[in-house]
Design a protein with these regions (language model features):
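Generic beta-structure capping elements
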Residues: 47-49, 60-65, 139, 143, ...
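Short secondary-structure boundary motifs at beta->alpha junctions and helix caps
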Residues: 68-78, 145-199
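A structural "domain/chain start" motif
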Residues: 17-83, 206
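Surface-exposed short loop/turn segments
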Residues: 18-40, 96-163
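Sec-dependent bacterial lipoprotein signal peptides
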Residues: 1-17
């Protein structure tokens, strides 16, 4: 009997000392258009994507106060933050431009593209209370044989700016959360980066 009680006590201690269950998150993206004929549609490659060093980790990072961040050890990205950003922006571009020919740099070895979209994320402020603010520098870089096709300037307020073979721009987007918790926060991040893709689309259409 004493042996049984000892075994039960040890089992309870082990259960109490076990690590919490890890939860995994991913950003949601718009469905990519399906078309029976994709030939002749613009082809885009999104990436590489760079993010601040403090964000480039498997754990979710959340702003807990003005100068303090919290790293959630047991709440992690199912893939990677950079991969999710590329996927969401890719899906946004595909939907808005009406082309299925959009892929991320990290997911494909294909170099047969018309334009490459480089994303340099300067900051992601994620707060459970106030939502998300993302600051992204981006570059639309034509393939070598498409240089003459893209000669627009990224500043929409400039009428006399010189023509350029590459467009560079910046998106500062804020998105409120729809509810409490990390699920709502990741959903807000998804919407914010989809809006970044929308701003890139607007410039490509000009």
């Amino acid at each position: 009997m004493r042996s049984l009680l000892t075994s039960l006590l040890l089992a309870l201690i082990l259960v109490g000392c076990s690590s919490p269950k890890t939860s995994y998150y991913k950003m949601s993206s718009a469905p990519i258009p399906t078309m029976s004929e994709a030939d002749g549609k613009i082809r885009l490659m999104v990436g590489p994507v760079s993010v601040p060093e403090r964000m480039d980790r498997p754990q979710l990072v959340v702003q807990s106060s003005g100068n303090e961040v919290q790293i959630y050890e047991y709440q992690r990205w199912a893939g990677s933050l950079k991969g999710d950003i590329a996927r969401v922006v890719s899906a946004s571009l595909a939907r808005d431009l009406g082309t299925p020919n959009v892929w991320s740099f990290s997911d494909s070895t294909s170099t047969n593209f018309d334009y490459q979209i480089l994303l340099d994320v300067q900051n992601i402020e994620s707060s459970l209370d106030s939502g998300v603010v993302v600051d992204v520098l981006w570059t639309i870089k034509p393939a070598s044989d498409k240089n003459k096709a893209l000669v627009k300037n990224a500043n929409p307020n400039s009428d006399t700016a010189p023509k350029s073979q590459t467009i560079m721009g910046r998106s500062l987007v804020s998105e409120a959360t729809s509810g409490p918790g990390l699920d709502a926060l990741v959903a807000a991040q998804s919407k914010a980066f989809a809006r970044v893709g929308g701003e890139i689309t607007q410039l490509m259409r000009r």
